[in-house]
Amino acid sequence: MSQAHFRLYHKDVVFATLIPAEEWLYDWYARCGYTQHITCTPPPADVDSMDFDTFDRWQRSKPCIVLHDKEGFDIVKEDFRIAQAIDPDAKRQQNDISSMIRIINAEMALTLYAGCHPEKEENIRVYNDSDIPMNNIYFCIKKGKVTRTNYPLPDTRSLTIQELADYIFADDTLLMTLMLN
């Protein structure tokens, strides 16, 4: 898992999401920096007959959702079509599923956060991210911008990478949909 996180960081990925297959995995993924601050919701009822533009309007109407691009949308639709060919009783997800999110790039995540909260002024220290040591640094959020430094800042809030995700999404109901389960 550490290697996967490190590789994702170098591909400029900001967040990683997953749906644990079994209950005990929630604790295991939490030790890897994931937090249960995201819900996987069922897709719109008529998603199989939607074109991407219609789906895109639907997903963008949500206040805080993981966005799918056209390629991802087409892949998920094709995978479901294949699943139904194998098992005609296969059904799309019907219930909300507690899922998990991890910050891969703290600076990029805080930059997105600062852009949405230009009134926010705070110093944050991320610590104890053993998977991505580049995240373990001080950040100053001010006037919609983020700066990073190796030097301690005054009145700093210290957060683990998991706590940082909880901090960033504290006021949001984060959703994802169209996940293969």
What do the PLM-derived regions correspond to, one by one?
Residues 1, 10-11, 26-27:
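Conserved glycine-rich acetyl-CoA-binding loop
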Residues 1-6, 31, 84:
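Conserved acetyl-CoA-binding loop-helix of GNAT-fold acetyltransferases
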Residues 2-4, 23-24, 37, 42:
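Core nucleotidyl-transferase/polymerase catalytic module
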Residues 6-21:
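Conserved GNAT acetyl-CoA-binding A-motif
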Residues 17-19, 84, 125:
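Short, hydrophobic beta-strand segments that form beta-sheet elements in well-ordered domains
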Residues 24-28, 32-33:
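Alpha-helical scaffold elements adjacent to nucleotide-binding pockets in ATP/GTP-utilizing enzyme cores
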Residues 33-122:
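Amide-forming acyltransferase catalytic core, primarily the GNAT-like/NAT-type
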Residues 92-181:
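C-terminal functional modules
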